A protein has these predicted regions:
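Extracellular hydrolytic enzyme modules, especially secreted metalloproteases
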Residues: 209-212, 709
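Long, contiguous, secondary-structure-rich segments that constitute the structural scaffold
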Residues: 358-418, 497, 507-513, 517-525, ...
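N-terminal intrinsically disordered, low-complexity segments enriched in P/E/S/T
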Residues: 613-615, 625-627
Length: 749
């Protein structure tokens, strides 16, 4: 999404879904994965007559609440949505004015969509043409419509294309920048958005700043450290600007291309140490490779309130340390919700026993590594003390201009926490006559200044900027192929100094665009751009003139820096339709993809995997467990609901293999790996597909490894990880693993 209109975050919010007239859920199961948030979907149905549409390989609990359901083959979401747009264009249901005024490149989409007739879509996706037609007409005629997705769209080799085709569908229908519309990504946990915002990714700095010399120097200035000192922490200066390893493939850095593993480029050295902070290691694919990577480390450190799976599945006998970390109830600070809202959390109890909050452990590490002074320089007071976490919140707000965290203060967020009941759940607006009147709950970013109320719905030009309005971000230049990339006249937030598109605000254009004259003092203090203006003057001046600092551009359907400039269907690496792999092949292999050589077409076309592994494999979640399950499987009551790992298998497929309900079965993958699990025989999956929940750990390929748990820490529920048999495959842009589509074979154990 960030490459479509500037930000890669949920555009609206859960309460706003109640304003939708139709809800298109593709690659998500909110009834199970977001059960509290799902009540907003049900209220939209009950109170607003919204039509609920679900597209999924399984008949899920969300599908059980749907008005319309399509059971799709895993990995074919792009053909389905192109099929929808084929019908939309054919029937003239598109929003022509929105397309003309606020988008670029839809003509290219129109050409591609013409190829995806209902009959072609049926052949590729398995969804009957009549079902596609019915769903498309309902969605097109019931606007505003909201598109909702989660990991079901992203965890594919073409995940980045999936998350572009859904926004393009919304642009075609004019469902963006309106209440009840938008692209509403459901994050897996409450602070996934906050973790993303703070750069828990290897290719950017906090706030999604690119790793280039200008931004590193900006951060050095704001952190009050020497740029040369920062640079000196890298083995060579150029490594300062390179992406690191991803969570999905860190282990490749340990294996270092040896014994047939994919080659790596890591300055001529292998990874020696790993620190795992609150991340379930079994939540990523290729667990046998993860295990090999763990075994090859010299040092493994785990920060967790519970025993991390990494310490259990490894065969290491030394060099493994478990540091007891405090839970969220034993510390305080901010998290960022799925809708970009900040939430303050207060400490409930002091850390128990010898546990410590994460930040204290990391401060101790920084002291021993010799850079505690630099790390804390801007958050220590005159007496060398740190007011935690308030000082950290202020530091973040002062630096991260790019997503507009500038308006967040501890005082504002605490006030919202104390008055959470005084906000309207559908609009997030503070109620009249209260101390939070005029502000949106959690100050959803961008919150440009301390007087700004936050932005509940992104890209809404019907509101003034000082009420959360904005156009699409100007992030991709002023023109492409001779076409102006700025929004048309009349497509700007109401009440602003500009009536149409304008570029992002910089020191050298602010006077012209805003129609102001800067003082010499303001010019001297001001940074070069709105995103690197440490003085805050650009944002303040923009608010006075009703201008969003990041500009007002067109959303683009064509991403000219991507391999696929418009989304293209490419078959999964392990596809049951080798005939379609020849027609819609994967990408060319990609060297140095986050430092690791990554196979695509060479693997996909090397053989017809479906002859030996004829069954589709997809993975997902359960309502009673979370993530890798370290915490939730330690609950006796939650574990009683699903005490053993299982596979959902269709009754006919089970009968074909002589399998009865709750028999043990072996599941084999093309990687040569296997798991032993129970069979749950249910009709919710198709005859050619099995489903695996991924919350278990403690067994590896039939081997009991629970003896590695320290005494008294073994969870109530243990079992095989689904990700032991998840197939090789990684997104071409992000390297997220392809866990939602793969192949396997089954046999009775």
């Amino acid at each position: 999404m960030a490459n479509t209109w500037g930000y890669g975050a949920m555009t609206n919010h859960l309460g706003d879904i109640q304003n939708a007239k139709s809800i298109f859920i593709v690659g998500a199961n909110p009834a199970v994965n977001h059960p509290v948030g799902f009540r907003h979907f049900l209220k939209a149905k009950e109170n607003n007559g919204a039509k609920l549409i679900v597209v999924d390989p399984r008949y899920t609990r969300t599908a059980a609440k749907a008005d319309y359901f399509a059971q799709i083959r895993p990995g074919t979401d792009i053909p389905f949505m192109y099929g929808m747009m084929n019908l939309i264009f054919e029937n003239g249901w598109e929003d022509k004015k929105f397309i003309d005024d606020r988008t670029y490149g839809i003509d290219e989409i129109r050409k591609e969509a013409a190829k995806w007739t209902p009959e072609v879509v049926e052949d590729v996706t398995g969804v009957p043409a009549a079902t596609l037609k019915e769903i498309t007409e309902v969605y097109a005629k019931n606007r505003p419509g909201s598109v909702v997705w989660a990991m079901g769209l992203t965890q594919h080799t073409i995940g980045s294309s999936n998350t572009r085709i859904a926004p393009i569908l919304q642009l075609v229908l004019g469902n963006m920048g309106v209440s009840g519309g938008g692209c509403n990504i459901l994050r897996g946990h409450d602070n996934v958005q906050g973790a993303s915002d703070m750069a828990n990714a290897p290719d950017s700095l906090p706030g999604y700043y690119a790793k280039n010399e200008a931004t590193w120097k900006y951060f050095a200035k704001m952190w009050k450290v020497d740029y040369e000192w920062l640079q000196g922490n890298f083995i060579k200066p150029e490594w300062m600007f390179k992406p690191g390893f991803t969570l999905a493939r860190w282990w490749a850095g340990v294996l270092d291309g040896k014994n047939g593993n994919d080659p790596v480029e890591n300055a001529g050295d292998s990874l020696k140490a790993l620190i795992v902070i609150g991340n379930g290691i079994t939540s990523t694919a290729q667990q046998v490779k993860v295990q090999e990577g763990l075994d090859g480390l010299e040092l493994l450190v785990l920060l967790d309130p519970f025993v991390n799976d990494a310490g259990v599945i490894t065969n290491k006998k030394d060099g493994v340390y478990l540091l007891p970390a405090a839970t969220q109830f034993e510390t305080s600070g901010t998290v960022v919700a799925t809708n970009r809202s900040g939430q303050w959390r207060s400490q409930v109890v002091e850390p128990l026993f010898e546990s410590m909050p994460d930040h204290e452990i990391l401060f101790e590490l920084a002291k021993r590594l010799g850079y505690y002074d630099e790390l804390t320089r801007t958050i220590r007071d005159s007496e060398d003390k740190i007011e935690w976490p308030e000082a950290a919140t202020r530091e973040i707000a002062s630096i991260v201009k790019s997503i507009g965290l500038t308006g967040w203060t501890p005082e504002r967020l605490k006030r919202h926490q104390a008055n959470w009941d005084k906000f309207d759940e559908k609009t997030l607006m503070g109620k009249e006559g209260t101390e939070v009147a005029g502000e949106y709950y959690g100050l959803p970013w961008p919150c440009w200044t301390e007087k700004h109320p936050g932005s509940p719905n992104l890209y809404d030009i019907s509101r003034p900027v000082m009420q959360g309005g904005m156009g699409f971000r100007n992030r991709f230049g002023l023109e492409h192929n001779g076409v102006n990339q700025l929004a048309a006249d009349g497509s700007a937030p109401v009440g602003g100094a500009q009536s149409g598109g304008y570029p992002e605000i910089k020191k050298d254009n602010i006077e012209k665009i805003l129609g102001i004259k800067l003082t010499d003092e303001e010019s001297e203090k001001m940074g070069a751009t709105w995103a690197t203006d440490g003085s805050g003057i650009i944002a303040e001046k923009c608010m006075e003139k009703g201008i969003a600092p990041y500009g007002n551009a067109r959303a683009r359907a064509v991403v000219w820096t991507f391999v696929d400039q418009i989304p293209q269907h490419r078959e999964p690496l392990h596809t049951p339709r080798q005939d379609l792999a020849q027609k819609y092949p994967s990408f060319e292999d990609k060297p140095n993809h986050y430092r690791v050589f990554t196979k695509y077409k060479s693997l996909q076309l090397s053989k017809d995997f479906s002859k030996e592994f004829p069954i589709n494999l997809t993975t997902g979640r359960l309502v009673n467990f979370s993530g890798a399950g370290m915490e939730t499987r330690a609950s006796m009551y939650l574990s009683r609901i699903t005490p053993e790992m299982f596979a959902d298998i269709h009754p006919e497929l089970a009968a074909k293999h002589g399998i009865k309900n709750w028999d043990f079965v072996w599941i084999h993958s093309p990687e040569g790996t296997k798991i032993k699990v129970r069979a749950r025989v249910v009709p919710s999956v198709k005859l050619d597909t099995i489903f695996l929940p991924f919350h278990w750990a403690g067994y590896m390929q039939g081997i009991d490894m629970t003896g590695n748990f320290p005494e008294g820490t073994k969870p109530y529920a243990v079992g095989e990880s689904a990700n032991t048999v998840a197939n090789y495959g990684y997104d071409i842009v992000t390297q997220i693993p392809e866990t939602k589509s793969g192949l396997c074979r089954i046999e009775k154990a």
